[in-house]
């Protein structure tokens, strides 16, 4: 039997892992200690969804989830990355791959949650983009560097295009695939907006 709730939780966990990996790897590259990497990985993992929920004035997702699994997933993922930092040290591009997965998952998830709360397409698109991009924005601000989304990358625009498709096709999977595909293409071929 198909359990939709289990699928949603699984996809959310994959997104949390991807963004926590991205944040912790960025911390490793800045020579942060394990606590710094955990804080950065966790902030990256939950940052976008937290901003979305605060703006929508709904309960913050990780404060109400079962046994704080969101925080536990982010902390554990960050510790794993810190402990395996030598494996990832020479693979700088891997941050972008994890980030692409997180962006696609959380853009769609943020859109769906916002549309459920507001029934407004415009608000849902903005909240989807914020959910997808917010964790990376928090990560970059914590590291005192220009946020990734402001550096000419096809990042927020990938989220926007995927979410526009979601409005017209009503297929979260297709929107996810489009966002991920755009990010993979831009990483692979070094495509920029400027």
Feature-to-residue mapping (PLM):
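Helix-coil boundary and interhelical linker segments in multi-pass alpha-helical membrane proteins
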Residues: 1-7, 54-64, 109-123, 167-173
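Core segments of transmembrane alpha-helices
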Residues: 15-16, 74-78, 99-107, 156-164, ...
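N-terminal topogenic module of multi-pass integral membrane proteins
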Residues: 1-57
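C-terminal transmembrane helix-loop-helix hairpin of multi-pass membrane proteins
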Residues: 119-133, 137-194
